[in-house]
Amino acid sequence: MNYTRRDGTPQRPAASLASGMSRRAAIGGAVAVSLAAPAIADAESGRPIRIGEINSYTAVPAFTLPYRNGWQLAVAAINQAGGVLGRPLEVLSRDDAGKPQDALRLAGELVNGEKVDLLAGGFLSNIGLALSDFARQNGALYIAGEPLTDALVWEKGQPNCFRLRPSTYMQAAMLVDEAARLPARRWASVAPNYEYGQSAVRWFRQLLRARRPDVEFVAEQWPALGHIDAGAVAAALDAAAPEAIFNVTFGADLTNFVRQGGPRGLFERRAVVSMLTGEPEYLDPLGAEAPVGWIVTGYPAEQLDTPAHVAFRDAYRARFGQMPRMGSVVGYALMYAIAAGVTRAGRLDLAALIGGFAGAAFPTPFGPAQFRAIDHQSTLGTFVGRTALSGGKGVLADWRYVDGATVLPDAAAVRALRPGTP
């Protein structure tokens, strides 16, 4: 089935893991096929494969609670289909409260005390970097779910770390493809002042200038994460008289920014390009105040009707009684990625796991994805569209799916970015 825009225009076909199968088979049976590689070493009489999962459950519940639902759904389906290497998956989940020091302490407890076979998860980019460094120093494997900074796989990339979600570079490249077509020359940016925000702005500016040398950035605002003075930020941006704004705020910061910027006229007669804003976690809280016409990355959960996504959405709604969010997709895909990597490795020692995950292909609700061997970044993509109002709430309209593989740099560029890459 093709992806289609909200107006019905067909998009590029995407391969489906569910073609010709029942919905139940799409969730479980297809994985049994793809993960039924020889159950060789490490069978250990069915001892569970233990995954130490760490995330910011109390700090960012809008994303991480649906994320937890997603991985729980996936683990249940994988185990029902026979598990991995003939063994069930067992997830030991911990809350880092949005604090790197807590994440490191929990990682130590999971690896050294609980003897987990690998680490997974993470939301904030600084926590993802901390967990990657822990894995490097302690001979563990870390599969990052949500942390978006490119340093995780490039500047600070290392063999023990793989990342699922499309990164700041990838999402910036998707947005720049639209932004470069705008007539605007004078740009301003607003982003949370930590690793994710800094990385997103750096790449957006660099990629946009490469496409549009006439562009200049006339203002930038760096509010502290979770502590935006939205009125002051809106006033400062407006005073710089930009023709377009690049926004990287999310969550409560985004809500405050929209509510303060709108009445001040900040968004009138200005294009806004915004990372993540089309994801339900961040769009839904705005209700009828959701902006109209912003160019965003996001997730059209109610509109996406490919077989793989319908199977996932139906199973998710049946179990949890609500629509999935982007966090749900990330949690779900993360466990399938782990299952595929472990299956390909055939055993659980670190060297085998690294070799197994490098190049591992896995199913997701958006279609097939794969971990690149050269930088350990997955090819999972996301959606680009425009915000609109429908039924008194914000929705993603005129959307298209962008395969992550189409926006990733080639091997030569990765070697320049990632030290020690052969």
Residue positions per predicted region:
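N-terminal secretory signal peptides
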Residues: 1-21, 25, 29-35
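Signal peptide-proximal N-terminal region
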Residues: 46, 69-91, 210-213
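Solvent-exposed, acidic/polar segments of extracytosolic/periplasmic ligand-binding ectodomains
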Residues: 47, 361, 365-422
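Extracytoplasmic "Venus flytrap"
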Residues: 52-72, 94-100, 123-124, 193-198, ...
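Beta-alpha junction/loop-to-helix N-cap segments that form part of ligand/metal-binding clefts
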Residues: 63-69, 84-152, 164, 223-230, ...
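Extracellular/periplasmic Venus flytrap/periplasmic-binding protein
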Residues: 105, 150-151, 159-263, 300-311
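Periplasmic-binding protein-like
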Residues: 110, 114-123, 143-145, 188-191, ...
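Extracellular/periplasmic periplasmic-binding protein-like sensory domains
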Residues: 260-332, 343-344, 348, 397-421
